């Protein structure tokens, strides 16, 4: 009875949230063309199909970052368990695009996650009948999880984390927090801080293991420095200094636009990479307002013509980082966002900068600051911090070396996570 009531209340909450967001969704559909290609699956009109026979593992991540970190895990699973079928879902269209690019060539079925209303997601879960469900970082959905468990599936959270704000909300509604995560068989978390937070909302300690942060993992074949290749592609001269501003939101653009023209004395080029392409016009308007002349990647404009380019393309941010002399991770000047993946620039051996709002990964950001791996900036010291790094190659190299050391020391996370999951897979009856 309690589970039925929880489910109905949860359905009611989702409907209310959807109605509240409906005007914004309508705006994105009409003016940006979003959700047009995915609405049939989102609303259960069209059911996804998985070809072939054999056991099925279903991976899920919210968006680009959560989906991308699954890559070494999925490749390893495919290598050691070739008879399994793979499904990868994401909530955002950017996440689905990334999953298709990374995992469709490996034979995975990729689609957007249907809405978690019981009448929509439950038939999909029953149809696919997964043996294993793996959630990336924390994007668990109650009906999806409960439906899979009813069918006897094992459910795991990997690279798990719980922000301080989420912990407070779940602690206030401790029964809901316990109900929300209790069906999980195992939570593989990033560190002890997140372990304490999950325990505060009622998750027993024997369901928790710590493996480290999967985003520190670098595959040998993908860790080759593509710096020369991409600098040549970008038409950069040896004397040019390139700043890559990744995953940018409008508030990040506002801050950087105020200082960008002060870097000309260093022969500086800037790539502005929006987090959401539907915000492209707003990004362009902010640069125009600041008097910054810029080109567009999609028009094949080059850094020979402009000192700034807006990269209105998906899936190339990591490659662009490899060409940079300095990288900034966006969302960190926007208190409503709280940052994105801080480790991508380090993986490409580039000095890292981020703003003051990093609550989405505050534990990692504090660790990076403490070990002097990343440079934390605010509006007041941004110009000075950038100029200091641009004019001092030795200082930039010192940050690169500390970043390499940090990743090397943290780089056992994937092996640990895989061994934990492998021990669980061995117990699954197929």
From Swiss-Prot:
GO MF annotation: an example: Kdo transferase activity
Membrane topology type: Single-pass membrane protein
TM segment ranges: 12-32
Pathway connected to this protein: Bacterial outer membrane biogenesis; LPS core biosynthesis
Entry's EC annotation: 2.4.99.12, 2.4.99.13, 2.4.99.14
Residues engaged in binding CMP: 274-275, 314-316, 341-344
Residues at the site labelled Transition state stabilizer: 137, 215
Top-level class of the enzyme under EC nomenclature: transferase
Keywords from the named record: Cell inner membrane, Cell membrane, Lipopolysaccharide biosynthesis, Membrane, Signal-anchor, Transferase, Transmembrane, Transmembrane helix
A cellular-component GO term for this protein: plasma membrane
GO process terms (BP): lipid A biosynthetic process; lipopolysaccharide core region biosynthetic process
Subcellular location: Cell inner membrane
Catalytic activity: lipid IVA (E. coli) + CMP-3-deoxy-beta-D-manno-octulosonate = alpha-Kdo-(2->6)-lipid IVA (E. coli) + CMP + H(+); alpha-Kdo-(2->6)-lipid IVA (E. coli) + CMP-3-deoxy-beta-D-manno-octulosonate = alpha-Kdo-(2->4)-alpha-Kdo-(2->6)-lipid IVA (E. coli) + CMP + H(+); alpha-Kdo-(2->4)-alpha-Kdo-(2->6)-lipid IVA (E. coli) + CMP-3-deoxy-beta-D-manno-octulosonate = alpha-Kdo-(2->8)-alpha-Kdo-(2->4)-alpha-Kdo-(2->6)-lipid IVA (E. coli) + CMP + H(+)
Membership in a protein family: Belongs to the glycosyltransferase group 1 family. Glycosyltransferase 30 subfamily.
Known role: Involved in lipopolysaccharide (LPS) biosynthesis. Catalyzes the transfer of three 3-deoxy-D-manno-octulosonate (Kdo) residues from CMP-Kdo to lipid IV(A), the tetraacyldisaccharide-1,4'-bisphosphate precursor of lipid A. Thus generates the genus-specific LPS epitope of Chlamydia, composed of the trisaccharide alpha-Kdo-(2->8)-alpha-Kdo-(2->4)-alpha-Kdo.
Protein name: 3-deoxy-D-manno-octulosonic acid transferase
Organism: Chlamydia muridarum (strain MoPn / Nigg)
Gene name of the record: waaA
């Amino acid at each position: 009875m309690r589970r039925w009531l929880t489910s109905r209340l949860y359905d009611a909450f989702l409907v209310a949230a959807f109605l509240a967001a409906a005007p914004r969704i309508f705006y994105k559909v009409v003016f940006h063309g979003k959700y047009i290609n995915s609405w049939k699956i989102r609303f259960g009109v069209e059911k996804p199909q998985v070809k072939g026979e054999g056991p099925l593992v279903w991976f899920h991540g919210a968006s680009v970052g959560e989906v991308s970190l699954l890559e070494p895990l999925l490749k390893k699973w495919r290598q050691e368990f070739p008879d399994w079928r793979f499904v990868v879902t994401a909530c955002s269209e950017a996440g689905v695009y990334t999953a298709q690019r990374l995992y469709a060539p490996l034979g995975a079925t990729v689609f957007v996650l249907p809405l978690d209303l019981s009448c929509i997601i439950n038939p999909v879960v029953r149809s696919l009948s997964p043996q294993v469900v793996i959630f990336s970082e924390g994007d668990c959905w109650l009906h999806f999880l409960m439906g899979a468990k009813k069918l006897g599936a094992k459910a795991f959270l990997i690279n798990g984390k719980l922000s301080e704000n989420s912990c407070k909300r779940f602690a206030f509604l401790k029964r809901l927090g316990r109900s929300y995560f209790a069906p999980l068989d195992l939570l593989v978390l990033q560190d002890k801080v997140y372990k304490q937070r999950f325990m505060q909302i009622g998750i027993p300690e024997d369901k928790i293991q710590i493996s480290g942060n999967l985003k520190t993992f670098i595959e040998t074949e993908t860790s080759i420095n593509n710096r020369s290749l991409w600098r040549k592609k970008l038409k950069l001269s040896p004397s040019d200094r390139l700043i890559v501003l990744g995953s940018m939101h409008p508030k990040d653009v506002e801050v950087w636009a105020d200082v960008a023209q002060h870097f000309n004395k260093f022969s500086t080029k800037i790539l502005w990479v929006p987090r959401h392409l539907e915000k492209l016009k707003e990004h362009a308007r902010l640069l125009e307002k600041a008097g910054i002349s810029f080109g567009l990647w999609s028009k094949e404009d080059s850094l020979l013509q402009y000192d700034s380019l807006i990269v209105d393309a998906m899936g190339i941010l990591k490659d662009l980082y490899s060409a940079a002399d300095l990288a900034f991770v966006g969302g960190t000047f926007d208190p409503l966002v709280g940052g994105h993946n801080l480790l991508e620039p380090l993986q490409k051996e580039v000095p890292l900068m981020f703003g003051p709002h990093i609550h989405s990964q505050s534990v990692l950001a504090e660790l990076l600051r403490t070990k002097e791996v990343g440079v934390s900036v605010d509006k007041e010291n941004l110009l000075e911090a950038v100029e200091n790094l641009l004019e001092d190659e030795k200082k930039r190299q010192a940050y690169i070396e500390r970043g390499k050391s940090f990743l090397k020391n943290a780089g056992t996370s994937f092996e640990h996570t895989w061994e934990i999951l492998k021990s669980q897979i061995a117990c699954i009856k197929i």
